[in-house]
Amino acid sequence: MTNIRKSHPLMKIINHSFIDLPTPSNISSWWNFGSLLGICLILQIVTGLFLAMHYTADTTTAFSSVAHICRDVNYGWLIRYVHANGASMFFICLYVHVGRGIYYGSYMFMETWNMGIILLFSVMATAFMGYVLPWGQMSFWGATVITNLLSAIPYIGTSLVEWIWGGFSVDKATLTRFFAFHFIMPFIITALTVVHLLFLHETGSNNPSGIDSNSDKIPFHPYYTIKDFMGFLFVFVILLTLVLFSPDLLGDPDNYTPANPLNTPSHIKPEWYFLFRYAILRSIPNKLGGVLALVLSIMILIIMPLLHTSKQRSMMFRPMSQCLFWMLVANLLTLTWIGSQPVEHPYVLIGQLSSMLYFTIILILMPLVSMMENKMLKW
């Protein structure tokens, strides 16, 4: 008799995706982050569902409902902080996942890569809307500033902003619709993730060497299930340490003050995982220019396959490209720091130089260095 996992229509899909999936034998721990993102997504959906049971999307009660969750609901504080810090873990995994894709040339799987970019946009939008829900000072002013960026769009900008707000300012209508979208988006993200995996399994996984691995594949289970489980444990320990010892470490103290449209915080800034984008936005003194730079800083990922001039797929054997890659990482960390600083000298100048360097490395230096490496290898 055939094994049920190989004959049952539903089990067969799971079997081909997670059990008997032929996987390159040499993929490193950098490949763990895809499965970690899946776990983060499940964790966010579960904790978010329980939070939604007690949260009220109304400007008069939103802030106090979050306080009620922390004080009166059984383990409400735990659910709330796992959700808030889970978002941070989500973005750490997301950025490492994208970084690994750039380093090892995974962007050459065009469909998977483009689907991943759509997922990145979706997760960013969801996180932004979630940050507005506690209705603290930073929630309110963050929503006001970021949605206001759309007013930079010529001709339709102002109408578009008022349409999103549902009025002439961020108010009850805005909060209600943000809650509705924040609730539905994770399920859309789950569906997009299935498509992302579908495209990936059409081609099979890339590997650190960047060369075809069809001659050397091993089953996903038990080799990579046990390896992924090790990754889960690491992330779980870090998340729990954060939640139980310093749950507000990555948050903003201003968000413990109820939203007040008449009082602007001295320094409006988004969550830490958006700070480098925010620094790029601020580095251009023109509103439309800043918005364009912000959008292009993410959209630039789409043209990654077109900028690939090397004869080798991976950076594993390309030391000059490796140096550039780590320069890019250091530059993004600098931008993250700049985004958290006030708009004054020398932060403005450092931000402008770092923003310029970000685009220069990706658009000019990486393709040029790849061509130089080809020449050095007489290819």
UniProtKB/Swiss-Prot annotation:
Binding site for heme b b566: H97, H196
Keywords, sorted A to Z: Electron transport, Heme, Iron, Membrane, Metal-binding, Mitochondrion, Mitochondrion inner membrane, Respiratory chain, Transmembrane, Transmembrane helix, Transport, Ubiquinone
Cofactors, names only: heme b
Protein localization: Mitochondrion inner membrane
Ranges that cross the membrane: 33-53, 77-98, 113-133, 178-198, 226-246, 288-308, 320-340, 347-367
Molecular function in Gene Ontology: metal ion binding; ubiquinol-cytochrome-c reductase activity
Cofactor note: Binds 2 heme b groups non-covalently.
Bilayer topology annotation: Multi-pass membrane protein
Residues the entry annotates as binding heme b b562: H83, H182
GO cellular component terms given for this protein: mitochondrial inner membrane; respiratory chain complex III
Recorded superkingdom: Eukaryota
Residues holding a ubiquinone: H201
Example GO biological process: mitochondrial electron transport, ubiquinol to cytochrome c
Gene3D superfamilies attached to this UniProt entry: Cytochrome Bc1 Complex, Chain C (1.20.810.10)
Annotated CDD domains: cytochrome_b_C, Cytochrome_b_N
Additional comment: Heme 1 (or BL or b562) is low-potential and absorbs at about 562 nm, and heme 2 (or BH or b566) is high-potential and absorbs at about 566 nm.
Subunit details: The cytochrome bc1 complex contains 11 subunits: 3 respiratory subunits (MT-CYB, CYC1 and UQCRFS1), 2 core proteins (UQCRC1 and UQCRC2) and 6 low-molecular weight proteins (UQCRH/QCR6, UQCRB/QCR7, UQCRQ/QCR8, UQCR10/QCR9, UQCR11/QCR10 and a cleavage product of UQCRFS1). This cytochrome bc1 complex then forms a dimer.
Protein name stated in the entry: Cytochrome b
Organism name: Fukomys darlingi
Source organism phylogeny: Eukaryota, Metazoa, Chordata, Craniata, Vertebrata
